[in-house]
């Protein structure tokens, strides 16, 4: 049934420009119509990460549900968790349209959205209505383009969402806000993480819970930069990493739209993001949680992220091309894999193929 829905929805949505198609898909999920059964429930897929118990390791990446409109609908598709955002303190329009481009031949997307969102207040109001509901919902926080103190924007994000988010993601790796990636430079990163974690700890005293904080990094980093980030993350006591955001590289892309500016996501990102993932796992050691994202479009690519060092895996662009049944299909196939290979937990495969990935050069 799900494959039929997928085959029907793609041509309908692809008849519209990408941003309008995205808006229509959000509207469809807001109706509450059960587009699928949510996939299998299997205890072998349960993963405990950063003090949170995930029913399965497959999550919806940030960027789809920017304004926290449909987190529960996403969980109902079979995702083990959903990440809303990126959300900035003040509403902002983002960059001029058109700003999303499908590269259908490459099963990829280029976006230069620029953190378009309705701001903290709207997202907070929606997430507050989830109080008492089950399901892991993270919030990805960013800085306004015109902010005079971007680090303060991240502090405000932590302060605003600590009580309503299962976890928080510090997004300093989008390529579509001028200067934002400069916060990954070691001196800036050190100050940012110190400030963010101070606010997190202040909020913990108020809400009686330390909300886990993850840092999302770019794939377009040097070996030296990765080492610096790893050291800062460990020193400042962050709860985990998300590897990685979209890339500025166009390697492996042949579609004419490849010349558009913006961040590339989808299948061509898989290789680079997985190399960076494995290198970061090697740098931070076995204890720090890592969420792997970039080019995941199947059970096998999800498994390979875990073999390369990921505790959890996120996807987004894969669902653009495969349809809303993708998460449930992946979860079902992960369960079958765990059963067929005699695993007690899918987590047992983590790190089983780090070396071939981590040894590859960052071209």
Curated annotation (Swiss-Prot):
Transmembrane segments: none annotated. This is Dihydroorotate dehydrogenase (quinone). It is a peripheral membrane protein. Keywords: Cell membrane, Flavoprotein, FMN, Membrane, Oxidoreductase, Pyrimidine biosynthesis. Monomer. GO terms for molecular function: dihydroorotate dehydrogenase (quinone) activity. Pathway: Pyrimidine metabolism; UMP biosynthesis via de novo pathway; orotate from (S)-dihydroorotate (quinone route): step 1/1.
């Amino acid at each position: 049934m799900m494959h039929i829905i997928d085959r029907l929805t793609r041509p309908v949505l692809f008849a519209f420009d990408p941003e309008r198609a995205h808006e229509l898909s959000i509207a469809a999920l807001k109706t509450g119509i059960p587009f699928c059964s949510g996939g299998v429930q299997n205890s072998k897929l349960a993963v405990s990460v950063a003090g949170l118990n995930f029913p399965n390791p497959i999550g919806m990446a940030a960027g789809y549900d920017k304004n926290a409109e449909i987190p529960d609908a996403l969980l109902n598709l079979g995702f083990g968790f959903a990440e809303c955002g990126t959300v900035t303190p003040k509403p902002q329009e983002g960059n001029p349209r058109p700003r999303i481009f499908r590269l259908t031949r490459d099963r990829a997307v280029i976006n230069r959205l620029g953190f378009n969102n309705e701001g903290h207040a709207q997202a907070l109001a929606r997430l507050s209505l989830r109080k008492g509901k089950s399901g892991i919902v993270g919030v990805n926080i960013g800085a306004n383009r015109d902010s005079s103190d971007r680090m303060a924007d991240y502090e405000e994000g932590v302060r605003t969402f600590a009580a309503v988010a299962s976890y928080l993601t510090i997004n300093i790796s989008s390529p579509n806000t001028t200067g934002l990636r400069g916060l990954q430079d070691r001196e800036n990163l050190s100050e940012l993480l110190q400030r963010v974690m101070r606010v997190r700890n202040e909020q913990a005293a108020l809400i009686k819970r330390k909300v886990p904080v993850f840092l999302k990094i770019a794939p377009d980093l040097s070996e030296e930069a990765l080492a610096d980030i790893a050291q800062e993350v460990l020193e400042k006591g962050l709860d985990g990493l998300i590897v990685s955001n979209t890339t500025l590289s166009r390697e492996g892309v042949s579609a004419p739209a490849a010349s558009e500016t913006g961040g590339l996501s989808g299948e061509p990102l898989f290789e680079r993001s997985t190399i960076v993932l494995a290198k970061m796992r090697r740098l931070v050691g076995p204890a720090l949680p890592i969420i792997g994202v970039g080019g995941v479009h199947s059970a096998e690519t999800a498994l390979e992220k875990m073999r390369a060092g990921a505790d959890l895996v996120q996807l987004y662009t894969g669902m653009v091309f495969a349809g809303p049944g993708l998460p449930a299909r992946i979860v079902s196939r992960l369960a079958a894999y765990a059963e067929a290979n005699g695993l007690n937990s899918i987590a047992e495969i983590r790190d089983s193929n780090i070396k071939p990935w981590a040894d590859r050069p960052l071209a």
